A protein has these predicted regions:
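Outer-membrane beta-barrel transmembrane domain signature
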Residues: 150-265, 269-275, 291-293
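Transmembrane beta-strands of outer-membrane beta-barrel proteins
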Residues: 32-38, 65, 75-79, 109-113, ...
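Short loop/turn motifs that connect adjacent beta-strands in outer-membrane beta-barrel proteins
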Residues: 20-30, 101-108, 137-145, 182-197, ...
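Outer-membrane beta-barrel biogenesis signature
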Residues: 9-34, 43-51, 189-191
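Surface-exposed strand-loop-strand hairpins of Gram-negative outer-membrane beta-barrel proteins
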Residues: 39-60, 76-84, 239-243
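Membrane-embedded beta-strands of outer-membrane beta-barrel proteins
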Residues: 62, 94-96, 132-134, 176-178, ...
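Outer-membrane beta-barrel "beta-signal"
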Residues: 280-293
Length: 293
């Protein structure tokens, strides 16, 4: 059981929009240049094999996004894997979405992401290349309840001399959350603001594939596909499925420090998996730095 590099915690866009809304800051359009840090599941050997151990390798993720004052946004990000055995730039993401933050009683939003993977033997392959993600938080109460829905789908084709193998896959996840944002003004200077958001999240869903879906804080090796005997001229289509079930509960601490146009956002998560072979309590750390224009 490992953690994926895309967490179910708040995105930078959501943190910024929530902070702007809470402080009733004047709405404006922005270009945001950012870089993230974290760990990604990767193979620990030069030979890709289902029996090899999966380890966590450090990555950095530069990104460029545009946020319109209406709530629409679009962005592109890339991922560079340190200590890679093959191509270090293993992934590119294209995202577009909409966040609605103008109502003081709730927050909601929806986004679509397309994932492009390079042919790297470092990271586990997946047919999941598209994602729809939606969230809703009711913030009239001191403790804010929220729900998120996450659906990913795609296919991956492998053509040989006499066969064409097509992997078709999808994953669906539901997240229930409780959180409360704390805002502190003028912590280190008169121009800075700190947003601290602890949350408790309960995740249910399928875990068919390694994936970068936003709900995939917890990655488990899916059951191995059955070996299919190849016949000349045949096109083989197959899928891999797991049940919709409770996957994990976590406590996440999001800290976001704003000073001028600069934002620093570390995050720490402790989680307890309910499925997979390893169900011990585990944790991971991610961080992000961004500058808005």
């Amino acid at each position: 059981m490992l953690c994926s590099h895309v967490a179910a915690s708040q995105s930078l866009a959501e943190l910024e929009k929530q902070l702007d809304s809470l402080l009733r800051k004047e709405e404006k359009s922005e270009v945001v240049l950012g870089v993230g840090y974290g760990n990604n599941p990767a193979y620990g050997s030069k030979t890709t094999n289902f029996e090899l151990p999966i380890i966590l390798k450090t990555f950095v993720s530069p990104s460029l996004s545009y946020y319109h004052k209406s709530g629409f946004y679009a962005g592109v990000s890339a991922y560079y894997l340190f200590n890679s055995l093959n191509k270090p730039w293993f992934e590119w993401d294209l995202t577009a979405g909409y966040d609605y933050t103008k109502n003081k009683n709730f927050l909601t939003g929806i986004s679509y992401t397309h994932y492009e993977f390079t042919d790297s033997s470092d990271v586990p392959t997946t047919p999941i290349t598209n994602e729809l993600f939606a969230y809703f938080y009711y913030r009239k109460w001191w403790v804010q309840p929220g729900v998120s829905l996450d659906y990913g789908w795609g296919k991956d084709a492998l053509e040989g001399n006499h066969t064409k193998e097509t992997f078709r896959g999808n994953d669906f996840n539901f997240i229930a959350a409780l959180r409360h944002p704390f805002i502190f003004n003028a912590v280190m200077s008169r121009r800075d603001v700190v947003l601290f958001t602890p949350s408790v999240n309960f995740t249910m869903g399928t875990a068919n594939y390694y994936s970068n879906l936003k709900a995939f804080q917890y990655v488990t090796r899916s059951p191995k596909l059955k070996q299919v005997k190849k016949h000349p001229g045949k096109e083989l289509n197959f899928e891999d499925h797991s049940n919709f079930e409770a996957r994990a509960i976590d406590v996440t601490l999001n800290l976001s420090y704003f000073i001028g146009r600069l934002n620093l956002a570390p995050s720490f998560t402790v989680f307890k998996p309910f499925s997979g072979t390893e169900q011990n309590i585990m944790s991971y750390f991610t961080a992000r730095m961004a500058y808005s224009f």
